[in-house]
Amino acid sequence: MNSIKNHLMCEEIHKRFHLHPKVRKAMESIEREVFVPAPFKHFAYTLNALSMQAQQYISSPLTVAKMTQYLEIDHVDSVLEIGCGSGYQAAVLSQIFRRVFSVERIESLYLEARLRLKNLGLDNVHVKFADGNKGWEQYAPYDRILFSACAKNIPQALIDQLEEGGILVAPIQENNEQVIKRFVKQNNALRVQKVLEKCSFVPVIDGVQ
């Protein structure tokens, strides 16, 4: 049963960012508390990003809602997430997309996220321990690709794994700031469709740990 606290959190998000009905329903369906480390459970329904292990963070629920909506979610089937983290973003995506694939480079985070998602019965979410810069070629092409970490550029491997006409949303490092950009794939290349807003994400890092 969805908690009143989670509902009120979604109300607060909606006041700041007008939510697509599908995004609001997805956010209300997933209890953020499940993904928050025990010392921070009392902050689970605030709009703050919260610390996890390995110098990583669970994103603000406002950010999760925005990133989900920026994907343009109507009439889509599959999404690839780069940077699973706690699994919260993937869980929200699972309420909208038929198939969710998420790659995590930190093994301890991968194991915890996979267990959380399994315990929630989210059978349409598939998580892989791997270098996110290489994507997940096995199930490509994807209708959407979402970066949950900040990239300096988009690797060719991920462009290749995006469906022609598909959308990729990513925080991009530009000089001394990060901005969220939405790209569309046209003629096998990415074109910036829209610069959405400034942001603050942990960086994409090569390799695994």
Swiss-Prot record:
CDD domains: AdoMet_MTases. It catalyses: [protein]-L-isoaspartate + S-adenosyl-L-methionine = [protein]-L-isoaspartate alpha-methyl ester + S-adenosyl-L-homocysteine. It holds the Pfam family PCMT. Gene3D superfamilies: Vaccinia Virus protein VP39. GO terms for biological process: methylation; protein modification process; protein repair. The active site is at 59. It comes from the Bacteria. One of its GO terms (cellular component) is cytoplasm. It is an enzyme of class 2 (transferase). It is found in: Cytoplasm. GO terms for molecular function: protein-L-isoaspartate (D-aspartate) O-methyltransferase activity. Catalyzes the methyl esterification of L-isoaspartyl residues in peptides and proteins that result from spontaneous decomposition of normal L-aspartyl and L-asparaginyl residues. It plays a role in the repair and/or degradation of damaged proteins. NCBIfam families: pimt, PRK00312.1. Belongs to the methyltransferase superfamily. L-isoaspartyl/D-aspartyl protein methyltransferase family. This is Protein-L-isoaspartate O-methyltransferase.
